[in-house]
Amino acid sequence: MAMATQATLFSPSSLSSAKPIDTRLTTSFKQPSAVTFASKPASRHHSIRAAAAAEGKAAAATETKEAPKGFTPPELDPNTPSPIFAGSTGGLLRKAQVEEFYVITWESPKEQIFEMPTGGAAIMREGPNLLKLARKEQCLALGTRLRSKYKIKYQFYRVFPSGEVQYLHPKDGVYPEKVNPGRQGVGLNMRSIGKNVSPIEVKFTGKQPYDL
């Protein structure tokens, strides 16, 4: 509104309609009234800005509590080198030819020895590593070892016979034992087990104590 009022004041039509007599006297005489008139919308703008700033802070606080927007799974590079291993991983299961197999990848800061989930020891290369395994549990076992002993983050995938790659873990980019804002708890009750109702109270109701 203030900008629209100023635009009408300085429009050519308003200037042409004004009387061209004693311009300097009129300007000097009306200066105090213009100053007092401008002081009112200034306070109004200040209150609007203060309200907008408060709304901005509230919106920022809400955004921090919400879940992070979108997670893009890392793409699998089939050209990643495998660790140096002289033994055998037991080979892929026969179902890998008709169903799927699993691939775990990680990046090592240096060349170091690690224990294979299938037995034996291997040397992980400095930089990216890729290892094919027959079972998902083997990937989880190796990944747990990488994180606990070597402080290395990992991810693994499921590869189908058609060549399709499915990203599996960590699903939302954060490992399950870590807190992730916005992650929904499954079967979560914010109470101790001692505060559950007595099982006899829900007997024959089709419910469980943790449902109430």
UniProtKB/Swiss-Prot annotation:
The keyword Lipid biosynthesis does not apply. Residues 145-153 are annotated as: Ferredoxin and ferredoxin-oxidoreductase binding. It is found in: Plastid, Chloroplast thylakoid membrane. Induction: By light. Belongs to the PsaD family. PsaD can form complexes with ferredoxin and ferredoxin-oxidoreductase in photosystem I (PS I) reaction center. PSAD may encode the ferredoxin-docking protein. This is Photosystem I reaction center subunit II, chloroplastic. It comes from Spinacia oleracea (Spinach).
